[in-house]
Regions:
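Short, solvent-exposed beta-strand-terminating loops
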Residues: 1-17, 262-271
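Metal-dependent phosphoester/phosphodiester hydrolase catalytic core
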Residues: 15, 137-168, 172
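Structured beta-strand-rich core segments of catalytic domains in phosphoester-bond hydrolases
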Residues: 62-149
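Acidic, Ser/Thr/Pro-rich beta/coil linker or hinge segments at domain junctions
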Residues: 254-297
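Acidic/histidine-rich helix-loop elements
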Residues: 6-37, 153-162
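Metal-dependent phosphoesterases centered on the DNase I-like endonuclease/exonuclease/phosphatase
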Residues: 164-262, 266
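Active-site metal-binding loops of divalent metal-dependent hydrolases
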Residues: 4-7, 62, 149, 191-192
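Single conserved hydrophobic/aromatic residue that forms the stacking wall/gate
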Residues: 301-302, 309-312
Length: 313
């Protein structure tokens, strides 16, 4: 999973507040900068694969289908042959979540967008949760959820109810699948804007690190308990981007088996720069405020072995 940090094209989307990422805006978002951003995202994804690119890549902060078309067809990633699915959310800025997939190892069966009805909570619209169903080589179905939870704008305490509400929608969907499938292979990835010990993850989803005996129909967070992080705030690393799987995926029933040790946060040197204020390293961002910096993203990418799927024959 990778939060690509504001992947916008240079064209205005009707009814969306994307004005800060237009050529005549103070940030000066040009075609050259847009294509450089695409090339950098492609570089990160290719680097994660070593010999082969990942079979599945979840993304968030993608503006639209046009951006993904350019990423998969007009960037160095074009040789990988990815296909993709993306939500069409009511988010005011127009950003969405998406999943890249390899057709040779993941046969798309269907997709669904889970909307988050915020009118009753007097909250502005947020991103839909993407649910993608695919068949893998074993013949089993892999259910993948990609999410980007409401931000911490206004403070953690004030904004928490919105993340709890969104997590409840995700939990209902995941729980129904876990109880429906004979082989519940469920993977949840995304920017939760919460840490592993926060209530949206630890209580609503009940997802903690796998310790002791694993239960097939429970959720486990492979990012819980990590010393390293995906995001740095005021000199401290933390994990806001989570990778959660069903216990069935941890029990080794088929080729998709994973483990806590096989999940990694990748800190490639080219993704980092010196933190001049707090010391140490910090992710190299595309913008610092309104100043173009030409980096990669505010977050690091994480991977897990379930993205290594056998080829479907």
């Amino acid at each position: 999973f990778y939060n690509v940090e504001n992947l916008f094209d240079c064209q205005h989307d009707t009814l969306k507040n994307d004005y800060e990422f237009l050529p005549d805006a103070p940030k000066g978002w040009t075609q050259a900068r847009y294509h450089d951003k695409l090339a950098k995202i492609a570089k990160v994804i290719i680097a994660t694969g070593e010999e082969n690119v990942p079979d599945l890549v979840g993304l968030c902060e993608v503006e639209n289908d046009h951006c993904l078309k350019d990423l998969t067809e007009n960037s160095p990633l074009r040789e990988a042959g990815y296909r993709y699915v993306i939500t069409d959310s009511p988010d005011e800025r127009g950003i969405d979540v998406a999943l890249l997939y390899q057709r040779g190892s993941f046969k798309l069966l269907g997709k669904n967008s889970l909307s988050v009805p915020y009118k009753e909570m007097e909250r502005r619209p947020t991103r839909d949760i993407l649910h993608v169903m695919g068949q893998v080589a074993s013949g089993d179905t892999l259910d993948v959820f990609v999410c980007h939870m409401p931000s911490r704008a206004g403070g953690e305490e004030k904004s928490e109810p919105y993340r709890l509400f969104t997590a409840q929608i995700l939990n209902i969907a995941a729980d129904s699948i876990i109880n429906l499938r004979q082989h519940p292979n469920v993977m949840i990835m995304g920017d939760f804007n919460d840490y592993p010990t926060n209530n949206s993850i630890a209580k609503v989803l009940g997802a903690v690190a796998p310790k002791g005996e694993v239960q097939a129909k429970k959720l486990y967070n492979l990012m819980d308990g990590r010393k390293e992080g995906t995001y740095r705030y005021r000199g401290e690393w933390g994990v806001l981007d989570q990778l959660i799987v069903s216990g069935f995926l941890l029990q080794g029933h088929d080729s998709m088996r994973t483990s806590y040790d096989k999940a990694q946060i990748l800190k490639y040197p080219f993704l980092l720069e010196e933190d001049e204020k707090y010391g140490g390293d910090i992710p190299s961002r595309t913008y610092w405020g309104k100043k173009y910096h030409g980096g990669y993203s505010l977050s690091l990418i994480h991977i897990s072995e379930p993205t290594r799927l056998d080829v479907i024959s």
